[in-house]
Protein backbone atom coordinates (compact mmCIF):
# COMPACT_ATOMS: atom_id res chain seq x y z
CA UNK A 1 0.00 0.00 0.00
CA UNK A 2 1.39 3.40 -0.94
CA UNK A 3 1.53 6.22 1.56
CA UNK A 4 -1.23 8.83 1.41
CA UNK A 5 1.09 11.85 1.48
CA UNK A 6 2.93 12.24 -1.82
CA UNK A 7 4.23 15.83 -1.63
CA UNK A 8 4.07 18.11 -4.67
CA UNK A 9 5.12 21.75 -4.27
CA UNK A 10 2.85 23.05 -7.04
CA UNK A 11 -0.27 21.42 -5.61
CA UNK A 12 0.58 22.72 -2.13
CA UNK A 13 1.04 26.27 -3.39
CA UNK A 14 -2.17 26.22 -5.41
CA UNK A 15 -4.34 25.08 -2.52
CA UNK A 16 -2.61 26.48 0.58
CA UNK A 17 -0.41 29.23 -0.86
CA UNK A 18 -0.65 32.93 -0.06
CA UNK A 19 -2.17 33.90 -3.40
CA UNK A 20 -4.74 31.12 -3.13
CA UNK A 21 -5.73 32.42 0.30
CA UNK A 22 -6.00 36.00 -0.93
CA UNK A 23 -8.21 34.95 -3.84
CA UNK A 24 -11.25 34.29 -1.62
CA UNK A 25 -12.95 36.23 1.15
CA UNK A 26 -12.63 33.35 3.63
CA UNK A 27 -9.00 32.89 2.65
CA UNK A 28 -8.35 36.53 3.52
CA UNK A 29 -10.04 35.87 6.88
CA UNK A 30 -7.53 33.05 7.48
CA UNK A 31 -4.58 35.35 6.68
CA UNK A 32 -5.94 38.12 8.92
CA UNK A 33 -6.56 35.69 11.78
CA UNK A 34 -2.99 34.41 11.51
CA UNK A 35 -1.68 38.02 11.39
CA UNK A 36 -3.69 38.90 14.50
CA UNK A 37 -2.35 35.85 16.32
CA UNK A 38 1.18 36.87 15.36
CA UNK A 39 2.15 33.86 13.26
CA UNK A 40 5.61 33.96 11.71
CA UNK A 41 4.33 31.96 8.69
CA UNK A 42 1.01 33.14 7.28
CA UNK A 43 0.70 30.46 4.62
CA UNK A 44 2.56 27.62 2.90
From Swiss-Prot:
Gene Ontology cellular component terms for the protein in this record: ribonucleoprotein complex; ribosome
GO MF annotations, alphabetized: structural constituent of ribosome
BP term (GO), one: translation
Classification via Gene3D superfamilies: 1.10.287.3980
Keywords, sorted A to Z: Ribonucleoprotein, Ribosomal protein
Similarity annotation: Belongs to the bacterial ribosomal protein bL34 family.
Name used for this protein in its record: Large ribosomal subunit protein bL34
Annotated organism of origin: Vibrio campbellii (strain ATCC BAA-1116)
Taxonomic path: Bacteria, Pseudomonadati, Pseudomonadota, Gammaproteobacteria, Vibrionales
Chain's gene name: rpmH
